[in-house]
Regions:
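ABC ATPase nucleotide-binding domain helical subdomain, centered on the C-loop/LSGGQ "ABC signature"
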Residues: 76, 136-138, 171-208, 252-253, ...
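The feature captures the beta-strand-to-loop junction immediately N-terminal to the Walker
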Residues: 113-115
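A short, proline-enriched helix->beta-strand linker immediately N-terminal to the Walker B motif
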Residues: 228-232
Length: 315
């Protein structure tokens, strides 16, 4: 814009433009144009800033409301998990699987496995009610989706395959503000010896996201926290993926003891412990098969092949 003013204004001063300007007239016009151009650009930026502020305010306004009092969470007790005709998937897409029926009792460990992207983790998250599911999930006759978030918090414990750790100490990460001694749970996940060898022991800070721990240590610490809070329904999504077979076998024995009052859903692609599970869910090609390990080996060739392939691996 300034270049055009200089060009055409110069022609007017020289008498070859559409009119004749004096130097004073040209200088005045150029100064006014510069001022207006500067103010106009600031006005555009101000308009954009106001528009962004309005959008941001709409987003945060619900968060500015008074938070309702959080009721005390009681873990309670669950005797029976019933799943009927369960369908899971992402909204708008073909379901990952459908027709899952399962009945499990307190003290049982249920394995979930299948090929990649068959819906194992999606099934685990269905117990959190993060997205709608078809069919029914009932705990002692109560539909999970109809419970309040606080009630579900007291009933369901979830451990994802990416451990979520806080930047506090090992003790704080296990107890989450509760009192007590976390060593029994650290012992159950074979982490007690490593913690004892640390200079600050239980007061060792793990760093944001557990960056000061190895992958296996972070995974075991998150599992210790899940076991410490003893929810009636435990969802463990691939909790042994960063561990060797010997450590996994030892932790599984402790899991049986510490989770004796819970129903455990164990999601894993490693099957050598599955013969010890009470039931197994096999997900593949949109279908769900449920049975004991022996039953699935006999009637599901893909499950049998995957188990045989892993059985030959050395620990």
């Amino acid at each position: 814009g300034a270049a055009l003013i200089l060009y055409f204004g110069g022609k007017n001063v020289l008498g070859t433009g559409w009119t004749v300007w004096s130097i004073a007239e040209f200088t005045t016009f150029l100064a006014c144009f510069t001022k207006l151009a500067t103010k106009s650009s600031k006005a555009a930026k101000l308009f954009n800033a106001v528009h962004k502020a309005q959008v941001s305010w709409k987003r945060i306004q619900p968060l500015m409301r008074e938070i309702p009092a959080v009721p005390a969470v009681s873990a309670g007790r669950v005797e029976r998990l019933e799943i009927r005709d369960l369908t899971c998937g992402y909204p708008g897409d073909t379901p990952l699987f459908s027709g899952l029926d399962l009945t499990a009792c307190r003290g049982q460990i249920i394995g979930v496995t299948g090929p990649v992207a068959c819906g194992k983790s999606t099934l685990g998250k269905a117990f959190l009610c993060e997205q709608p599911y078809g069919g029914s999930i009932r705990l002692d006759g109560r539909e999970l989706a109809e419970l309040s978030p606080w009630e579900r918090t007291g009933l369901v414990g979830y451990l994802g395959h990416d451990p979520e750790l806080f930047s506090g100490t090992i003790r704080e990460n296990v107890l989450l503000g509760d009192t007590g001694d976390p060593m029994d749970y650290l012992r159950a996940v074979c982490l007690d010896g490593e913690v004892a060898a640390m200079t600050e022991g239980l007061e060792t800070r793990v760093g944001t996201g557990g960056v000061r721990l190895s992958g296996g240590q972070a995974q075991r610490l998150a599992l210790a926290r899940t076991l410490a809070h003893q929810r009636p329904l435990l969802i463990l999504d691939d909790p042994f993926s960063a561990l060797d077979r010997a450590t996994e076998t030892e932790i599984f024995a402790h899991l049986r003891r510490l989770a004796a009052d819970s129903v455990v859903i164990l999601i894993s692609h490693r099957l050598y412990l599955f013969p010890e599970l009470d039931q197994v869910i096999w997900l593949e090609n949109g279908e769900a098969k449920v049975g004991t390990h022996e039953e699935l080996v006999g009637n599901t060739p893909d499950y049998a092949a995957q188990f045989d392939a892993q059985r030959g691996e050395q620990p």
